[in-house]
């Protein structure tokens, strides 16, 4: 075996008290932050995806599928005009 890199082993890290003190706070905090990000609707605003009640409006009930192989830009323009 070659020389030691000076790093602690994984088993040594996960059995330390300091690891669990830090991670017992950060892991639940990340979970709660993610849940709030999604449940408040901020994820829809940040990523620009439609909310569940905005997929189909009264004037647009069809599914926006690209069916033509040779004219996809025309179909995309048609779909974007309906927004």
Curated annotation (Swiss-Prot):
GO CC, any one term: photosystem II reaction center
Database matches in InterPro entries: PSII_cyt_b559_asu, PSII_cyt_b559_asu_sf, PSII_cyt_b559_CS, PSII_cyt_b559_N, PSII_cytb559_asu_lum
Residues at which heme binds: 23
Entry note: cofactor: With its partner (PsbF) binds heme. PSII binds additional chlorophylls, carotenoids and specific lipids.
Transmembrane intervals: 21-35
Entry keyword set: Chloroplast, Electron transport, Heme, Iron, Membrane, Metal-binding, Photosynthesis, Photosystem II, Plastid, Thylakoid, Transmembrane, Transmembrane helix, Transport
Membrane-related topology note: Single-pass membrane protein
Cofactor field: heme b
A Pfam family reported for this protein in Swiss-Prot or TrEMBL: Cytochrom_B559
Lineage top rank: taxon: Eukaryota
Molecular function, one GO term: heme binding
One GO term of the biological process aspect: photosynthetic electron transport chain
Chain's role: This b-type cytochrome is tightly associated with the reaction center of photosystem II (PSII). PSII is a light-driven water:plastoquinone oxidoreductase that uses light energy to abstract electrons from H(2)O, generating O(2) and a proton gradient subsequently used for ATP formation. It consists of a core antenna complex that captures photons, and an electron transfer chain that converts photonic excitation into a charge separation.
Family under the similarity heading: Belongs to the PsbE/PsbF family.
Oligomeric and partner information: Heterodimer of an alpha subunit and a beta subunit. PSII is composed of 1 copy each of membrane proteins PsbA, PsbB, PsbC, PsbD, PsbE, PsbF, PsbH, PsbI, PsbJ, PsbK, PsbL, PsbM, PsbT, PsbX, PsbY, PsbZ, Psb30/Ycf12, at least 3 peripheral proteins of the oxygen-evolving complex and a large number of cofactors. It forms dimeric complexes.
Name listed for the protein in its UniProt record: Cytochrome b559 subunit alpha
Organism of derivation: Daucus carota (Wild carrot)
